[in-house]
Amino acid sequence: MTLADEEAFLTVHADIPRQGPGMPEDVHWALDGLEVGREARILDAGCGPGADLETLAEARPMARIEGIEQIPHLADEARERLRHFTNVQVMTGDMGALSGFYDFIWSAGAIYFLGVTEGLTLWRQSLALGGAIAFSEPVLEPGAPQAAKDFWADYPQITDYAGLQARVEAAGFDVVDHRALSTAAWAAYYMPLAARVARLRAGADAALEPALAEAEREISLWRAAPEHVRYELMLVRPGTGPS
């Protein structure tokens, strides 16, 4: 991706509530399922513009919460969004090179940049004793229609749930619980993105055209099979396997 392509992509994806599927209910389910304490040390790895950070801050007002995001303008959006929360700090940096220790690491749709096994192995070094991780990752269900396969064509590493579980276990983690994100969680991402694309279309120059077309293509592929385009939300803890 050239610098111009990257700038166009960031323009298209700017000023929307989130950069991937998810709902506040998903965050609450993970916090409850992993029994994350009121004063826990929490990290949102790949926090984007801060949608889930906001939910974490509201759910655990006494916790120490950090977000890390590699893309500066998304980190800036998160800082602006969380400016009223005194217990939240947003850092611009690499989620693969953490320096703190955390009781709970949350990562919505971002661990695939590192690889599931690789990311969990790295993050294990930053987990406090008794700590846990929640992350969402694409899965391709057996018998998925062609539309779902087309949606994930640019992610050849995708696997089914059994394959995802194997990647978790290869990092020395046990699965505590898991569930698929709802269609509403996907709509929470794609509906604002579709509205953003429509607004930009009105006065778009040629430089934005490829990024707009790609966003429209992605949304169209999702709409073709919304029940089969799937993220699995995984709750995991270090086990007795390799670390």
Regions found by a protein language model. Name each.
Residues 104-117:
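A short SAM/SAH-binding and catalytic strip from SAM-dependent methyltransferases
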Residues 96-105:
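A short acidic, Gly/Pro-enriched loop at the edge of an enzyme's catalytic core
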Residues 137-155:
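Short, glycine-/aromatic-enriched active-site segment of Class I SAM-dependent methyltransferases
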Residues 118-132:
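A short glycine-rich, Lys/Arg-flanked "PGG" loop and its adjoining helix->strand segment in the class I
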Residues 39-48:
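Conserved class I S-adenosyl-L-methionine
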Residues 20-38:
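Conserved alpha-helix/loop element of class I SAM-dependent methyltransferases that forms part
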Residues 49-96:
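Class I SAM-dependent methyltransferase SAM/SAH-binding core
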Residues 179-243:
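Conserved Class I S-adenosyl-L-methionine
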